[in-house]
Amino acid sequence: FVEMFGNPRINPRQYPVSELSEYIEFLTSGSRGWAKYCIDDGTEWFITIKNVKDCRISVENMQSVNAPNNAEARRTKVQEGDLLISITADLGRTGVVTKEIAEHGTYINQHLICIRLNKAILNPLYVAYFMESTAGKEQFESKNQSAVKAGLNFNSINSLRIMVPPISIQEEFVSFVKQVDKSKIVVQKALDEAQ
C-alpha cells in the first residue's frame, strides 16, 4: 500500500483528501437480537467481528442463520463490494464482501457497519487497506466514543478522512492485491499436499 500510494499520514503524492461521507451511497449497522435465527443448519450466513479482519471476510466459522423475511433483514443483507467495518470492541477491522459471500445470502450483526461506496471514485478494497493503515487506525482511535467501551457511530464513520487517488491507480492496487492472494492460495495448497 505504502509503496504505491506513499504514507497516507504524509500524502507525499498530494492526492485529494475528503470525508468518506462524500462517497457513501448506503450506510447501515447490523441487526441486534438475531440469536433466535442462528441455527447450525441455517441456509444463510451471519457475519460477526470475528469474521472480519485484515481487509477480508473469512467464511471459516461463519454463523448459520435462517433470516426472517422482514425490513430489518433486507436492510442488513450484504451485497458484493460492500465494505464492512467493526464499530465496537476491536475498532476498524475491515473486510469487503465477495461475490461468494453475497450470493450465499449473508447478514451483519450490530457490531459491524456496512458501507456501499460510489465505486466510480472509490474501490472498497482500496478503502479497506487505507482504513487498516496507520492513518486509518489513528482516526478510529481519535473517534472512539468511550474510554470504557469502544464504539463508533454513523457520524464518526461519515467524517473519516480518506486519501482519494485516481480510480485507475486504486484498481491497479486492487489487481495486485488479488494476484498476491491467488499466489498465497497456490503456495498454501502446495504446502498442504506436501504434508
Cite the ranges covered by each PLM segment.
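Non-catalytic DNA-recognition/assembly elements of restriction-modification systems
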Residues: F1-S31, S159, M163-E171, K178-Q195
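Low-complexity, Lys/Gly-biased intrinsically disordered segments
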Residues: R13-R56, A71-A73, Q145
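A generic structural signal for short beta-strands and their flanking turns/coil linkers
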Residues: T43, N61, N109-H111
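A short beta-sheet element
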Residues: T48, A73-E132, K149
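Short, basic/aromatic beta-hairpin or loop at an interaction surface
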Residues: N51-S64, T106
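A short glycine-rich beta-alpha junction/loop motif
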Residues: H104-I113, L125, Q145-E171
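Periplasmic-binding protein-like
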Residues: G136-F140
